[in-house]
Design a protein with these regions (language model features):
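Nucleotidyltransferase catalytic core that binds NTPs
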Residues: 1-328
Length: 328
């Protein structure tokens, strides 16, 4: 195993293997920063905990807030590093597993060049072969001047419902951290099938820098591949939609709708249409990245969090600027 003190190579794709609990949660953001700084294109973050056992269906929704906090902590930490080095296309993926064997199942279709672990933690045999480098990261990482609170396991009270079929929607252009938080949470509560509606190309003609929008075939493939990696035990129906409703307008099997706080208004429109068509109501799950992240991230303020550049619009603007500078 190589130590950071002796060598600082750059790897195309790296994998961070991290045992997650309340104590280690305060070090996660800085550990992610160190791993990304040794990675060129992509970092796969494997977080391990017995609490991530998603086969216990009755506990999935009760852990909603805690799981959301974990994903926000990891993804926004990664987004800030990508922003600092002006690389919004750097790809970060987070998976939640109970052990290394389950991680290997989730990552069966993925490839990586190096495995990062904390000092004293051996790289798991299930994720390492002769072609991989293994790198040891400092076990106690703190960022000067930051306040990061431990993430305690908090569960929701009340009836623990099981959702066989859930739905969510969006453009999902250049699948970024914000998208992945939304999709991951939808997959987390789902036990059988996740429907992901993607705005068809015809709906995006008024978007800024529309020439850089990925075609619908690319976007649907990216979503399906991400769900397969995050939770391979469920089906993913990634489908093009021509309106804000998609399959929720006619599919009676949908039990839950997952939205962001920015698209909450559209959820009420969908609920009204289903009522008019005598379709079963859907339970609503809302993700609020800003309010959640302020609990666990360094105290950079709401404005700084909004500037984390987790948007497809920003990525297209970045691509346009990059192309413009190359033409000069």
């Amino acid at each position: 195993m190589r130590s950071m003190e002796t060598i600082s190579p750059s790897y195309g794709t790296s994998l961070l293997y991290y045992h997650f609990d309340e104590k280690s949660s305060v070090h996660l953001a800085e550990t992610i920063r160190l791993a990304i700084n040794q990675s060129v294109q992509r970092l796969i973050i494997v977080l391990l905990s017995p609490e991530f056992d998603h086969s216990q269906h009755e506990h999935l929704t009760s852990k909603w807030d805690w799981i959301q906090n974990i994903l926000v902590l990891a993804y926004i930490a990664a987004a800030h590093v990508s922003q600092d080095r002006d690389d919004p296309l750097f790809d970060t993926d987070v998976i939640l597993v109970r052990d290394s064997d389950q991680a290997a199942q989730h990552l069966a279709h993925e490839r990586w060049d190096a495995v990062f672990t904390l000092e004293g933690v051996p790289a798991p045999k299930a994720l390492v072969n002769a072609s991989h480098d293994t790198v040891s990261l400092p076990a106690a990482c703190h960022t000067q001047g930051s306040t990061i609170h431990p993430l305690k396991l908090v569960t929701r009270e009340g009836k623990r419902k099981i959702y066989s079929v859930s739905a969510l929607g969006g453009t999902f252009d250049y699948l970024h951290s914000g998208h992945k938080i939304l999709i991951s949470m939808g997959a987390w509560i789902t036990t059988h099938r996740l429907i992901v509606g993607l705005s068809d190309d015809e709906l995006l003609t008024r978007k800024a820098n529309k020439q850089y929008i990925q075609p619908i075939t690319k976007r649907t493939a990216s979503v399906a591949a991400f769900v397969r990696m995050f939770k391979p035990s469920i089906e993913c129906d990634a489908v093009a939609i021509q309106d804000v409703y998609g399959p929720t307008a006619w599919d009676p099997s949908v039990q839950a709708l997952v939205v962001s706080s920015e698209t909450l208004g559209g959820a009420s429109t969908v609920a009204q249409l289903r009522s008019e068509r005598s379709l079963p109501p859907m339970d609503l799950f809302v993700i609020d990245v800003i309010s959640t992240s302020s609990v666990v991230l360094p105290e950079r303020g709401t404005a700084a969090l909004r500037d984390a550049k987790m948007s497809s619009t920003y990525i297209r603007e970045w691509l346009a600027r990059k192309e413009g500078s190359q033409e000069k």
